[in-house]
């Protein structure tokens, strides 16, 4: 198992390439379509880095995984699918996100709320094959109702936590930054606490890969820790922090946070599996901005 991270400084997002060298198969996780909110321009520079690395490895893309419907960047999954293939997968509870935001954006009857925009909807405990690797979907709601953690192990080997990895999306961050916010529609701090405890019940040596790193105090980029690191050092949820204490802390902290800059553009695209709106009769695509609604 090889894991490579690709950091996008504009959104502090880490996209991942998960590679099984024996089979040559790979998965791309939480990709980014570059978007400039001032000009409305999209670019594919971040996604093209993944494409170049896939080509350099001679890999075959089997899965394009989303840990959740992101509210801080646009997904590049459809672009990647056209360039390198792969099936787009997300947690089945994406339908709850589609219900909420379909109404907010007045998406109309043409917008299906059944997750059919994605190739594969995953339930808790579902597994995906990637060569000799097994990817298990672990439902970890709290940040959003649809959040999934992807736990990766060798499919046919005796379990060894040193060879296990989990892509945690927006649940945990590096120990010096803590945990994800829970104040988006459908978010819930108590659910997040329980989800994180589920992640932290994995073997202590399991490597945890973050979806974001905000470089507190200007430190260098970091995006991987272990279960043991988080239990020992996480500033929000280390061992000994009770559920009630966490909920109180998370609720108070969330009340001070601004909305992500790209939330409105991101969600209306990502609830459609990253597909941009169809051009109107003048050949131009448009995003919607609801006024005084959030």
Swiss-Prot record:
SUPFAM superfamilies for this protein: Metallo-hydrolase/oxidoreductase (SSF56281)
Gene Ontology molecular functions: hydrolase activity; metal ion binding; sulfur dioxygenase activity
Alphabetically ordered keywords of this record: Hydrolase, Metal-binding
Class of this enzyme: hydrolase
Binding site for a divalent metal cation 2: 72-73, 170, 212
Family matches, as CDD domains: POD-like_MBL-fold
Cofactor: how and how many bound: Binds 2 divalent metal cations per subunit.
Metal-binding as UniProt keyword: yes
Stated role: Probable hydrolase. Does not have beta-lactamase activity.
Protein name stated in the entry: Probable metallo-hydrolase BURPS1710b_2304
Annotated organism of origin: Burkholderia pseudomallei (strain 1710b)
